[in-house]
Amino acid sequence: MRVAEVTRNTSETQIRVSLNLDGSGRQKLASGVPFLDHMLDQIARHGMFDLEVEATGDTHIDDHHTVEDVGITLGQAVARAIGDKKGITRYGHSYVPLDECLSRVVIDFSGRPGLEFHVPFTRARVGSFDVDLTIEFFRGFVNHAGVTLHIDNLRGINAHHQCETVFKAFGRALRMAVELDPRAANTIPSTKGTL
């Protein structure tokens, strides 16, 4: 089974992430940031991952450290669960619509962290959630999962829909990329022989 549990403790946050890449979309989420929990639910359900997140942090200051550190810890959990990358599809992509909104996410388990994030949010907050923290979540994930990630909101008016389509598309793209390809069996999906 491709599972991992990662704990991250700093002076700002205490995070625990448990992940099963071959799950059924079950989740248990308690990040302390309700909108983040809603977005993590999208990743679990649309990626078909079993995901548990427990976090406490300095949310009395703001949500920045918690959101970023959950992204970091999730990235570490994915990297650990995927192991040597033998047999994975490597690349994943997804387009997800929600009413007027359309987002595209493309991921490559290249071993080279890189983020292209193009989401022109139409407002600064969704409820109490600062939408600027979305990029911090994905930057933390990318740097610790070792992936190249392109996120584009192609159109949208409602900032909640913009966030939600991004996270849904991310879950689906991630699911595609980590899927085991029986034809590739025990090979690394690279002409270099390593990722």
UniProtKB/Swiss-Prot annotation:
Q: Which UniProt keywords apply?
A: Amino-acid biosynthesis, Cytoplasm, Histidine biosynthesis, Lyase
For this protein, the record's Pfam families field holds: IGPD
EC number, UniProt record: 4.2.1.19
Coiled coil: which residue ranges? none
GO MF annotations, alphabetized: imidazoleglycerol-phosphate dehydratase activity
Compartments where located: Cytoplasm
Q: What is its main location?
A: cytoplasm
Q: Which HAMAP family match?
A: HisB
Q: What is this protein called?
A: Imidazoleglycerol-phosphate dehydratase
Q: Which gene encodes it?
A: hisB
